[in-house]
Amino acid sequence: MATVVADMSVSLDGFVAEADGGVERVFAWYGKPQPESQPREGRCEPGASGLRVIVAGRRTFEQAEGWGGKHPTGALVIVVTHGIPEGWPREGAAVSFVTEGIETAMKQAAAIAGDGVIALATPSIIQQCLNLGLVDRIQVKVVPLLLGAGIPMFGKLTGDPIELENPTVVEGNGVTHLHYRVPDQRRAA
């Protein structure tokens, strides 16, 4: 069974991007040398441990210009969207599109991932999956930055508050990694 991981870089005040969608400052740590103790799977690097599928939204897909048809990690990308962009799908691209909603996308991701990792790569996808009880772990990369406004990571959660287990904390250069396990009672069977 796949492990579903919500994985995002965020400002200290909880924003994944500036109000205009800019992410340069939130992701500036990616260009800095990191200590050996930094978890590879948390950085979504090529060869990251067990990463098989990334589920993203249309906005992220467009901002990344479709990753040129292949995500840098080598993982398959499933884009949840209301409509398939013009010129897609492309032959040989490791990007597919789901127009039937998040539940269909997650079923497809699970079938592809097997016992590997499914990374959730956008706030709206993370929020929808948390609301459905589909998330096993939350990995946030907190950068020492206060944006004051922007796109929040957890802006539209529904239901009861989610109490997470104690985090694993890994200090990096310009980033602190916080890895939380979502308790079993919050996950769908």
Regions found by a protein language model. Name each.
Residues M1-A189:
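Enzymes that bind and transform nitrogen-containing heteroaromatic metabolites
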